[in-house]
Amino acid sequence: MAKNHKVEPVGGPPSDVEHLKLESNYLRGSLTDSLANRITGGLPDLDNRLLKFHGSYMQDDRDYRNEREKQKLEPYYQFMLRVVTPGGVATPEQWLLMDSLADKYGTGSLKLTTRQAFQLHGVLKWNLKKTIQEINAAMLSTLAACGDVSRNVMCNPNPYQSELHSEVFHWSQQLTSHLAPKTPAYHEIWLDGEKVVDGAEQGEVEPIYGPVYLPRKFKIGIAVPPSNDVDVYSQDLGYIAILGEDGKLAGFNVCVGGGMGMTHGDTATYPQLAKVIGFVTPDQVLDLAEKVVTIQRDYGNRSVRKYARFKYTIDRHGLPWFMDELQDRLGWELAPAREFHFEHTGDRYGWIKGKDGKWNLNLYVQAGRVVDTEDNKLRSALREIAKIHTGDFRLTANQNLVIANVTAQKKTKIVALLKEFGIAEGSNYSALRRSALSCVALPTCGLAMAEAERYLPSLIDRLEPILANAGLQDQEINIRMTGCPNGCARPALGEISFIGKSPGKYNMYMGAGFTGDRLSKMYKENIGEDEIIDTLTPIIDRYASERNKGENFGDFVIRAGYVKAVTDGTNFHD
């Protein structure tokens, strides 16, 4: 294939963040000195930005912000630590370690994220190094859990369900390792590794990223049809596993250019769906990923960060240009994409027996928050299970948890423990609640404009009787809520979704595809709870009485004319 046209990288002066990365000496900056400063519980802005690459965000508890300001105190600074777990897999020993850190340094809970990672909230600055050291001692890491690099690689979390799942999990590990930053700064700062005075003296420190890394974060996910639980079309780079005639992994369809984030009021920003561009064999997976990443490295927008994601690079230059550039770098052509079929994006709850004879239990975890409450001792139950479990824990892309690779003997014991602590598999919750996703939002996320995790359950409380009255209590409807438009809970792929606009107010969207292949469309702007209920009630009632057999909610609201179908993000605001 010949090149259609030559494209130059985006012009304009590099942003302040680009200068920061360049001058950071491969992510060192002055982090060591700032961490040692006992005068403040926070970090200077420049080091705070660098800290993301090391897997942490500085936050403050916004519930206390006004009161502390009145008392002339600095904000209640604390840090969120995100732990990289490729494919969401953790051993029982690693689970117990994270559980203990939640009490030792955190706020007494664990957050399971929509990208299959752990988050630990409330860590104080003076405890950061100790926490990271304990995490690494358990063969986990926070490096590249955040920052302008390839993040935690997602995949279907049930590798013991079949040989195919096991192979796919292997590639999530390989991709995470291959694309991880190679700078020794992480080991120097956190693990007391041997210090290198000047990273440049080592030669090529970052052979893939270079000294300024990527223009923005880069997300990779691997889906295993018929489940699109990882929302593969939301990824910068997606792999769709294809089964061969021999029942083994033949390779992957590849899709590029997805992403959920946008900025309120700026129609030049939008969520986007990744496009399928071809098929690769397993031995081509790493080469393809590296070349795709380097295209974004070289052509992504480094002047304006809100336009810097890979989706804008592709949309700006065009898919034909991207394919030419990719082939030039690869030196070989992708094969034509193969047939596949997705049926759902949600989790399948309860016990499932794998082909190897072992069991997997998918547990519902509301908003991914593992915590003990007065009426739900989930954290205690999982702690006791981890003490006897000989398989794995697998975090799902829907913020739930799979207790995987369970023997028949251990299954009996785990069932007894769940009963002892009163934990249900998920069948006692409504289909709507089981299909809900939300980000953390307030009080710790500095970007949140409204509540999400703390509020969505109560909104569902009001929606459940409406659905029950319509006979839809068992109908899966993907509902998602975020406190801002950055898209952490992938709201643009919710059949019903809410994006925070201001305290108590949300933009309401509808019409995304049930299998994650169509974006939602804004239906109402800046509305509160009562208007949400008043708006959805007649739509739900009409859906119950007028839907076609097997018709999902997102498809119905388009057919009924409530919103238009959005299959490309460039039409999201039309």
From Swiss-Prot:
Keywords: 4Fe-4S, Amino-acid biosynthesis, Cysteine biosynthesis, Heme, Iron, Iron-sulfur, Metal-binding, NADP, Oxidoreductase. It catalyses: hydrogen sulfide + 3 NADP(+) + 3 H2O = sulfite + 3 NADPH + 4 H(+). Signal peptide: none annotated. Binds 1 siroheme per subunit. Its EC number is 1.8.1.2. Siroheme binds at C488. GO terms for molecular function: 4 iron, 4 sulfur cluster binding; heme binding; metal ion binding; NADP binding; sulfite reductase (ferredoxin) activity; sulfite reductase (NADPH) activity. [4Fe-4S] cluster binds at C439, C445, C484, C488. It holds the Pfam family NIR_SIR. Belongs to the nitrite and sulfite reductase 4Fe-4S domain family. This is Sulfite reductase [NADPH] hemoprotein beta-component. It comes from Paenibacillus sp. (strain JDR-2).
